[in-house]
C-alpha cells in the first residue's frame, strides 16, 4: 500500500492547494 500512496501523494499535492494537500496526506498516513 505504501507504493500506491507514494504515487498518489505527489498528484494530490499538484491538484489541490498546499493546505488541503497536507490535510489529505495526514488522513492517508493515519489510514495506514
From Swiss-Prot:
Processed by the macrocyclase-peptidase enzyme POPB to yield a toxic cyclic octapeptide. POPB first removes 10 residues from the N-terminus. Conformational trapping of the remaining peptide forces the enzyme to release this intermediate rather than proceed to macrocyclization. The enzyme rebinds the remaining peptide in a different conformation and catalyzes macrocyclization of the N-terminal 8 residues. Keywords: Toxin. Signal peptide: none annotated. GO terms for molecular function: toxin activity. It comes from the Eukaryota. Residues 1-10, 19-32 form a propeptide. InterPro entries: Amanitin/phalloidin. There is a cross-link at residues 11-18 (Cyclopeptide (Ile-Pro)). Probable toxin that belongs to the MSDIN-like toxin family responsible for a large number of food poisoning cases and deaths. Belongs to the MSDIN fungal toxin family. This is MSDIN-like toxin proprotein a. It comes from Amanita phalloides. The gene is MSDa.
Amino acid at each position: 500500500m505504501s507504493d500506491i500512496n507514494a504515487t498518489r501523494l505527489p498528484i494530490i499535492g499538484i491538484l489541490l492547494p498546499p493546505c488541503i494537500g497536507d490535510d489529505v496526506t495526514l488522513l492517508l498516513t493515519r489510514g495506514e
